[in-house]
């Protein structure tokens, strides 16, 4: 993912 949190892998900014 791009710009994600390690705990919550979402394709953010």
UniProtKB/Swiss-Prot annotation:
Highest taxon above the source species: Bacteria
UniProt-recorded name of the protein: Lipid-A-associated protein
Annotated function: Is associated with lipid A, a phosphorylated glycolipid that anchors the lipopolysaccharide to the outer membrane of the cell.
């Amino acid at each position: 993912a791009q710009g994600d949190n390690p705990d919550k892998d979402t394709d953010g900014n």
